[in-house]
A protein has these predicted regions:
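Short glycine- and Lys/Arg-enriched binding-loop motifs that mark or flank ligand-binding interfaces
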Residues: 20, 32, 118
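Sec/Tat signal peptide C-region and signal peptidase I cleavage site
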Residues: 18-24
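N-terminal edge beta-strand
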Residues: 24-43
Length: 129
């Protein structure tokens, strides 16, 4: 009776410790500007997101909002017009604002799925001075 329990325990531990591609989810590994960074308008001509895996292009959705403006208390978030494109590597997305970003706080939201097809989402903010 001990042998089957030991074998099952060993198999369960091996499965738990083994890396699994199926359990991976798309997530942002880095961004430019970085989350919570303060940058000049010149350095905010594009926003780049780099993910941990190739994305399924039809699942990618991004948004860019201005959430704060100097001197304006309780600023209502405003959508910022932008174009976007996926990198040739399939792991990166570039947002290109149609107009230069003015001083203020911005929020990038994203949703995407990788090979496991689980749609993940996230957001980060940065400030333009």
């Amino acid at each position: 009776m001990r042998k089957p329990i030991f074998s099952l325990s060993l198999a369960a531990m091996a499965m738990a410790l083994a890396p699994s591609v199926a359990m991976a989810h798309a997530k942002v590994m880095s961004s430019t500007p970085a989350a919570n960074a303060t940058v000049s308008s010149a350095k905010a001509k594009s926003i780049n997101l780099v993910f941990n895996e190739k994305l399924l292009a039809p699942t990618v959705k991004t948004d860019l909002l201005m959430t704060g403006m100097p001197g304006m208390k309780d600023h209502t978030p405003m959508k910022v017009a932008f174009g976007s494109m996926m990198g040739k590597d399939g792991k990166s997305v570039m947002l290109m604002p149609k107009k230069a970003l003015t001083a203020g706080t911005y929020k990038v939201t994203w949703a995407a799925a990788g090979s496991d097809t689980h749609r993940m989402n996230g957001e980060f903010s940065f400030t333009v001075k």
